[in-house]
Curated annotation (Swiss-Prot):
The lineage of its organism: Bacteria, Bacillati, Bacillota, Bacilli, Bacillales. Keywords: Amino-acid transport, Cell membrane, Membrane, Transmembrane, Transmembrane helix, Transport. This is Choline transport system permease protein OpuBB. It comes from Bacillus subtilis (strain 168). The keyword Membrane applies. Coiled coil: none annotated.
Length: 217
């Protein structure tokens, strides 16, 4: 306990900055993932063939070791935050893409026909009918992706990306448990807090009727 208190006294200010770095690289990667995966998911629902293949390819990328992905970008982008964000972006895509595809495919076809009947264009159907109804499922994918990235972002320090992983790597290299705890505990707290916030957002986006069905089931 004495070592942990000493760690906080010595590194309190830097700990806040490392936490900010960790949140920043994770958040940027998730936002990029949303900007790519949601439109791609919409496009895949319009494809009669090939959607499963594309999702399968993204799934393969997801199974690659995190350190291998990070190392792959070093010759291309060097070291620092940029390659870390790009690598995390690739990991963020699958849950969002899969849930967008599943959510939109699950929209009641009668509602789409009603939209056509009142003169909605395909773009208006996506914007006003499909995305709002699929929003809870999409948000669940964003939530999953974000929690994954909070954990994976600790590896960003491997290529100089910063974040709370710096403390974990220092602790492992120098065998200083207080540094490991100083990095691991804030990451865990971040994951719990962000998961709670996104769970609330997911509930807010779920229509009242669907919420009642979930409660009854």
């Amino acid at each position: 306990m004495h070592h942990i208190v000493q760690f906080l006294q010595t590194n309190g200010g830097e700990l806040l900055y490392k936490t900010y770095e960790h949140i920043t690289i994770s958040l940027i990667a998730v936002i990029l993932g949303v900007l790519v995966a949601v439109p791609l998911g919409v496009v895949l629902t319009r494809m009669k063939k090939g959607a499963g293949t594309i999702i399968g390819i993204v799934n393969i990328i997801q199974t690659l070791p995190s350190l291998a992905i990070l190392a792959f970008f070093i010759p291309l982008l060097g070291v620092g935050k940029v390659p870390a964000i790009v690598a995390l972006f690739f990991y963020s895509v699958l849950p969002i893409l899969r849930n967008t595809y599943t959510g939109i495919r699950g929209v009641n076809k009668n509602l789409l026909e009603s939209g056509k009947g009142i003169g909605m264009t395909p773009a208006e159907q996506v914007r006003l009918v499909e995305l709002p109804l699929a929003a809870p499922v999409i948000m669940a994918g964003i939530r999953t992706s974000t929690i994954y990235l909070i954990g994976w972002a600790t590896l960003a320090s491997f290529i100089g990306g910063g974040g709370l992983g710096d403390y974990i790597f220092i602790g492992l290299n120098l065998y200083q448990p207080e540094y490991i705890i100083g990095g691991a505990v804030p990451v865990t707290i971040l994951a719990i807090v962000i998961d709670y916030v996104l769970a609330v957002a997911e509930r807010k986006l779920t229509p009242a009727g669907m919420q009642r069905l979930k409660e009854l089931s």
